[in-house]
Amino acid sequence: MSLSPSDRELVTEELGREPTPAEEALFENLWSEHCAYRSSQPLLSAFESEGDRVVVGPGDDAAVVALPDPETGENSDTYITMGIESHNHPSYVDPFDGAATGVGGIVRDTMSMGAYPIALADSLYFGDFDREHSKYLFEGVVEGISHYGNCIGVPTVTGSVAFHDDYEGNPLVNVACVGLTDDERLVTAEAQTPGNKLVLFGNATGRDGLGGASFASEDLDEDAETEDRPAVQVGDPYAEKRLIEANEELVDDSLVRAARDLGAAGLGGASSELVAKGGLGAHIELDRVHQREPNMNALEILLAESQERMCYEVRPEDVDAVAAVADKYDLGCSVIGDVTDGNYVCTFDGETVVDCDAEYLADGAPMNDLDHVEPTQPDRDRPSPDLETAFEAVVAAPNTASKEWVYRQYDHEVGTRTALKPGDDAALMAVREAGVGLAFSSGADPNWTDTAPYDGARAVALENATNIAAKGALPLAAVDCLNGGNPEKPDVYGGFRGIVNGLADMCSTLDVPVVGGNVSLYNDSPSGPIPPTPTLAMTGTKPGYDAPPAALSGDGDLLVVGDGGDLELGGSELLAQFGGSDQFPALPDSPAAFIEAVADIADLDSTHATHDVSHGGLAVALAELVGDAGADVDLAGSPDALSVLFSEAVGRVVVETTDPEAVKERLDGVAPVEHIGHATDSGRLELSVGDETLSYSAADIASLRSVIGETLE
């Protein structure tokens, strides 16, 4: 990829001369789709990013949100950071290193804000599970995430995994991170004062990851696994762990004025964006950069995406103290230049190789005005499998099967904050500094957004909010990772517009600010584009750290709360297994009131278990609830067994309660409540639908749901 003729003409006009090779490469990378969001930026204004608890919104390395005081409800002095990134193309070329460095990058984004990383979430998307190449990528990605996350001591506590044919040539690896800081430790990526020093801190610079930003802004071709391997970074988690602790010490000692991690476009990207955000410039001597490879030229030093590096703005009088911290943690430290009130200037070997306006470099890329075609929903053409066949196929499908094989590889309890572990609707982290539980949910469903991009994305937002509410928490804020194919194709761009508007509309309805995010386009390969995929990572808060599990106790009545409407089957796993088509299910009319009511119900002493109804429908929700305790469920009044069991209409929760009247009272005027049966001590699911009856032991269900683990072990 190279700077387009039209972009080159703009740059030449701005500079008043031809760009140097280093300048041309910098503009190529910083004006790429990956960095400049040229096709998506015009759409992102749909998101509401402000709110009473939002301290720092979009535009920094990570967002910052104040936690509520559990006694007063006012903002506390304890903040969380939220960020999300994609490492899609690199994870196709090299699944282990691509995924591992994705973790490292989002953790450093967290550190840039003066925060300590406390939790990770991974949302992963692959081709059909039956294909060997999909399994190869899946295993490599999970190994990369677990290796890096476990080594740095940050727990991966929640996430999602989805399989869909259209990811075969382009998997998605989306990783979110939550960090913890406070009002006195907050750092931003906005340079403060001319005369301050720019310090490159961390690992030495090599040639790995060269041109990674431009690589991420083009379609993958058939030879990507070999030809594009140099564009994939290689991580060192042990250096990252030292960097985390060193950064914590620097922030504690107030030695950092501003910070930016070195990710896309390397040193050139981080340093130019840092000063541009402050309306300033820089003078950088590239010869001063500590390097691990000989004979590196200016372009390589500027654009290499070597990992575990930070760019700090430091007061001159603090440079020695910063160097001492680097020495303590066996990390490199180079004073590479100064913050100025002029241009962004880089010299190498006594010559000026870059001299341009920092803001023009960082923010001057022209936006794309692209054509789009509005998606249409499919007609109804539903299959007619018998109920037993349908139940076993859907419960055993890789999309709905147990993901224990994934999360048992992650150290999800390191840090001693994990109160509710992976495998539930949402994770729950103990933030003792504020006395609140922090719920954390992440994911999307490509079947939903492939069927109906707008309504499917609305459902993604509502499902994440329902996951959080089912654990007794109220949504706080969200970040998104918007993944799409080649936006120059009108049908692809139409689907992408749909997921942007759908997420934005539902988050606005729920009063959940979308405080940051990431866009990844050109996820296209010779096999075609990916489904439009709006990964959403959402947090919520509640007093205390207790929550009802997604497992039955055996003592209560079973209720389904929420309105499934006509229970259409569009986007369902049933259709994925048996073919056919249908409209996407309608969403509830008052989702915000429903979420508040569910959170209240989850916190009742009489509530013993809660589990949202989503992927795989009510059938999978009931199967997942059964363990030592069982369920006797009677849906005899339902005329359409397939719809009632397999519709994935969101905004519904199964509740086990010893006080059903309290649940009905709280939902009066908000959403319907249906009594469907009782929890038992049998360890069996006894299910009657119409005139048909199904019966499965917990062991039967576990066997059906173990397809991933059994296949990969």
Curated annotation (Swiss-Prot):
One of its GO terms (molecular function) is magnesium ion binding. It comes from Natronomonas pharaonis (strain ATCC 35678 / DSM 2160 / CIP 103997 / JCM 8858 / NBRC 14720 / NCIMB 2260 / Gabara) (Halobacterium pharaonis). Pathway: Purine metabolism; IMP biosynthesis via de novo pathway; 5-amino-1-(5-phospho-D-ribosyl)imidazole from N(2)-formyl-N(1)-(5-phospho-D-ribosyl)glycinamide: step 1/2. Mg(2+) 1 binds at residues 85, 518. This is Phosphoribosylformylglycinamidine synthase subunit PurL. It comes from the Archaea. Residues 1-20 are annotated as: Disordered. One of its GO terms (biological process) is 'de novo' IMP biosynthetic process. Its EC number is 6.3.5.3. It catalyses: N(2)-formyl-N(1)-(5-phospho-beta-D-ribosyl)glycinamide + L-glutamine + ATP + H2O = 2-formamido-N(1)-(5-O-phospho-beta-D-ribosyl)acetamidine + L-glutamate + ADP + phosphate + H(+). The active site is at 34, 87 (proton acceptor). One of its GO terms (cellular component) is cytoplasm.
